[in-house]
Amino acid sequence: LPESEWQVEVRILPKGELPAEWRTNPDPWQAFLDRDSIVGQLRLRTRFTGDRFHPLGLGGGRKSLQEFMIDAKIPQCLRDKWPLLVDDEKILWVAGWHISDKAKVNPQTREVIWVRFCRSAILDGKRV
């Protein structure tokens, strides 16, 4: 994201090479996505008015991104800057929170997109 402290790392892995902890995923800043669920190109962006999201664990249901961010207790001052991983059709991952149910790794998954966000440290206004 322009003028952001966020850095992102992306790798494509065969499903058989997933790390052992991928199902429980102890790191909220990494996500494992079904490559076949991606439509078009991956992009990073912030929220748009009216965004909707299919959070994993909601039984395939849809929720407004604003409502999701409120429920997740993302501070209001950060919501317009919060990184979203999207494709041409949908929000794939609200970084640090949930992936989309539409992008989850499933039994038919052959390749996985592994994504990790990290925030650069800022010290006295300078990146370190």
Regions found by a protein language model. Give the residues of each.
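Basic, glycine-rich polyanion-binding accessory segments appended to enzymes
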Residues: L1-V128
